[in-house]
Amino acid sequence: MAKGKDVRVTIILECTSCVRNDIKKESAGISRYITQKNRHNTPSRLELRKFCAYCYKHTIHGEIKK
C-alpha cells in the first residue's frame, strides 16, 4: 500500500496576462488549463507557456490554488 499523500496532483493553470488585464476589462475571460504534476519532481509552482484563446497568443500560464 502507498504511504502518505498521492504523488500526482491535479492542478489548474491560469493565464497571467488575462488576470492582469481583467482590471481593465479588455479580455472576455480568463484562460485556464487543467493538468497533473508530480509533487516529488516539481515541488514548486508550475509555469508553462500555453495558448490563450482570449489573448490570441502564447502566454505564461501559472499554477493557482484550488
From Swiss-Prot:
Keyword Chloroplast assigned: yes
Stretches assigned to coiled coil: none
GO cellular component: chloroplast; ribonucleoprotein complex; ribosome
Record keywords, A-Z: Chloroplast, Plastid, Ribonucleoprotein, Ribosomal protein
PROSITE patterns, sorted: RIBOSOMAL_L33
Annotated GO biological process: translation
Keyword Ribonucleoprotein: yes
Pfam families in alphabetical order: Ribosomal_L33
Chief subcellular location: plastid
InterPro entries, sorted: Ribosomal_bL33, Ribosomal_bL33_CS, Ribosomal_bL33_sf, Ribosomal_zn-bd
UniProt-recorded Gene Ontology molecular function terms: structural constituent of ribosome
Compartments reported by the entry: Plastid, Chloroplast
HAMAP family: Ribosomal_bL33 (MF_00294)
Family: Belongs to the bacterial ribosomal protein bL33 family.
Name by which UniProt lists this protein: Large ribosomal subunit protein bL33c
Provenance organism: Lepidium virginicum
